[in-house]
C-alpha cells in the first residue's frame, strides 16, 4: 500500500504496517509539517497558489487604498503564511505560533498609512484568529476600507510547479 498524506494518513499507514501490511508512506501536506522532511508534496504548489493571490490582491488593494486581510491555511503551523507573506511583501504576517494584539496591529497600519503607505496586505494563518473578526476590528479602528479574503480549499489544488514536472517525468 502506498499512502500519500499528512499526519492522519501516515498514522493510519503506521497502523497498517503494525498489522504486517507492506506500506510506503509519502509526506503529502500543504502545511509542510511532517517531521524529518524538508518539503512535503503539495507545499510548493500551495505556496505558488497563495503567492499568486497575494499579488492579485496587492493590485486591487493599491488601486483602491485598502487593507486586505488574506486568510490562508495553517491551523497549527504558520509556515505557509510566513513563506508567502515574505515573498509577497505583506505588511504583517499573523501565525498561531506568535501572539499578537489586534489593537497594536491597527495602530501600526494607521501609522503606515499616515506615513504614505496607502494600502496594506496582512497574511493570516487560520489558526491565528478569525480573518473576518480581525478585519472588522482593523476597519473600525483605522477608518480604512478593509476587506477580507479567505482562500480556503483552493490552496489544496493546482498544477505542480514546473520543477517537479520535469524532475519526475519518466524519460
Spans of features found by a protein language model:
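Catalytic, metal-anchored helix/loop core of enzyme active sites in primary metabolism
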Residues: 139, 144, 151-170
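Short beta-strand elements at the ligand-binding edges of bilobed clamshell
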Residues: 36-47, 158-165
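Acidic/polar active-site rim loop that often engages polyanionic ligands
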Residues: 26-39, 62-63
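Anion-binding (especially nucleotide phosphate/pyrophosphate-binding) glycine-rich loop
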Residues: 1
